[in-house]
């Protein structure tokens, strides 16, 4: 007498009814986790691009790198000092100083310091300054005055770097006193910080805007 009951096949693939419910729940969690990881990576890429766009607005130029020393109990400690000018060529500029044991670290610190000391510069339609201004820092003095369209930036050294990164295209500048790059750059920053638009000047003097132009 033959047995008609089906024999079990060890190589047979289990069907959906044979898979426990707990295993199905685990598979669903893994699928959700995979989608979440992909979405997170996609979001990180978007955030990185936005950060790069913000950083690309700023330009930095190294004015000077010097090797300096500090006398300590054990002898002399050598380091580097970098003077960096940071600007977006849209009316914002800053001068920073950074010190570190290597040049790259000093420049990086100088850029961060420059972004902490930004000055907003009022620009005219022709990318010049509205009025004459004079700034001092230590023994350095800088005089800047507006110029006609097509004149360009008539300045030299660190003063020219500050004016160009501020977005000024037509200006005349005169250096008086010390020739130190850091003092001249800071004196130019003081002169730019003292600038006022014609509207602000009229409000401070208590007169109309027409009287300013007359």
UniProtKB/Swiss-Prot annotation:
Keywords: Ribonucleoprotein, Ribosomal protein, RNA-binding, rRNA-binding. The keyword Ribonucleoprotein applies. Part of the 30S ribosomal subunit. Contacts proteins S4 and S8. Residues 58-121 form the S5 DRBM domain. Belongs to the universal ribosomal protein uS5 family. GO terms for cellular component: small ribosomal subunit. Signal peptide: none annotated. This is Small ribosomal subunit protein uS5.
């Amino acid at each position: 007498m033959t047995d008609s009951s089906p024999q079990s096949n060890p190589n047979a693939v289990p069907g959906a009814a044979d898979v426990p419910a707990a295993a199905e729940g685990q598979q669903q969690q893994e699928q959700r986790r995979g989608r979440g990881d992909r979405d997170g990576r996609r979001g990180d890429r978007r955030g990185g691009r936005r950060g790069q766009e913000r950083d690309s607005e700023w330009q930095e130029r190294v004015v000077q790198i010097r090797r300096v020393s500090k006398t300590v109990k054990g002898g002399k400690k050598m380091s580097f000092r970098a003077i960096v000018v940071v600007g977006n060529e849209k009316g914002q500029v800053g001068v920073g100083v950074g010190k570190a044991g290597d040049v790259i670290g000093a420049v990086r610190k100088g850029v961060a310091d420059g972004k902490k000391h930004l000055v907003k510069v009022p620009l005219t339609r022709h990318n010049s300054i509205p009025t004459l201004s004079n700034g001092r820092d230590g023994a350095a003095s800088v005089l800047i005055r507006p110029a006609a369209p097509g004149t360009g930036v008539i300045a030299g050294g660190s003063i020219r770097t500050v004016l160009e990164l501020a977005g000024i295209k037509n200006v005349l500048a005169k250096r008086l006193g010390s020739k130190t790059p850091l003092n001249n750059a800071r004196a130019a920053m003081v002169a730019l910080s003292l600038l006022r638009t014609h509207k602000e000047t009229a409000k401070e003097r208590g007169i109309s805007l027409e009287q300013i132009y007359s």
